[in-house]
Regions:
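Glycine-/small-residue-enriched capping loops at alpha/beta junctions
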Residues: 1-104
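Small side chains
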Residues: 17, 185-188, 233
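Phosphate/ribose-phosphate-bearing ligand recognition and processing surfaces
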Residues: 79-190
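Charged, low-complexity interaction regions
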Residues: 174-182, 193-202, 216-227
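Short amphipathic alpha-helical heptad-repeat segments
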Residues: 181-188, 200-212
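Flexible loop/turn and low-complexity linker elements, especially glycine-anchored beta turns
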Residues: 192-193, 203, 230-245
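Cationic, hydrophobic amphipathic alpha-helical membrane-interacting segments
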Residues: 207, 211, 216-218, 229-235, ...
Length: 248
């Protein structure tokens, strides 16, 4: 599965399904949901009214109508109230339900907005750190998942979460398993902010070599601390341009 973290407008995204941060009433309450409702048209809004309510931690699906995606998944994440009321569990539940609905329809290419981090005040870094590992593991059966970000800060948070995911998993692997995982991790990290649907093999190979030049010394450390992971992640993050926006 290819996982990309890109800047863009989710309401204009070309994918089989779009997943956005919805309210329990399915009425638009943030900038992304407002654009989706506006561009989806009257039939789209009517289908949301017909569905009525959706509980926090769950998701429902409608057709895309006038949007470029065939299906829209309305995922209801939690409001942040300090992290003591099970917000992370509810957030992950909303992502899981969205993946389940997409899988039921045999969708292959999904595009996600950042759930709960705008009007619901969920801390961005915490949301990204929770969501990305789930998407990379439980979303492995899809061809591609895009995290469509509305700001460079959002893109940086989800990119860093993906880099941390791979560094941690590589560090925990051993022997042949680590070598096999590196063959997957190198291209995955190199393509993380790539806008190209079919990247040039030579250019991709060069990017992978840059990644490996950072990761291999990190993996040779006998004891890897959080500081070591942070340092390796910072070096990988420095390889990406300040922002990458997909042409839609």
């Amino acid at each position: 599965m290819q996982f990309r973290v890109l800047l863009g407008d989710l309401s204009e995204w070309k994918a089989d399904g779009l997943v956005y941060s919805a309210s329990s009433t399915l009425l638009p309450t943030n900038s992304v949901s407002s654009k989706i409702h506006q561009k989806g048209g009257l039939s789209f809004s009517a289908s949301c009214r017909t569905l009525g309510m959706c509980h926090v931690g769950s998701a429902v699906m409608t057709k895309g109508y006038k949007l470029k995606a065939s299906f829209i998944i309305h995922a209801v994440g939690p409001y942040w109230v300090g992290g003591k009321r099970g917000e992370e569990g509810e957030l992950l539940s909303a992502y899981k339900k969205a993946l389940h609905l997409a899988d039921e329809k045999h969708l292959k290419h999904l595009a996600f907005a950042s759930l709960s981090t705008e009007e619901k005040r969920y801390p961005l870094q915490r949301a990204a750190a929770a969501a990305v590992p789930l998407l990379l593991t439980e979303g492995a059966g899809f061809d591609r998942i895009d995290m469509v970000c509305t700001s460079p800060e959002e893109q940086e948070a989800y990119t860093k979460a993906a880099v941390f995911f791979w560094l941690r998993h590589l560090g925990e692997a051993a022997g042949n398993e680590q070598a096999a995982m590196m063959e997957e991790a190198g291209p995955a990290l190199a393509l993380l902010q790539s806008c190209d649907d079919a990247p040039d093999p030579i250019a991709l190979s060069e990017e992978v070599k840059k990644i490996e030049a950072i990761v291999h010394p990190f993996l040779k450390l006998r004891k890897r601390s959080l500081v070591d992971i942070e340092q390796a992640a910072s070096k990988i993050m420095a390889l990406y341009p300040e922002s990458r926006t997909e042409g839609v």
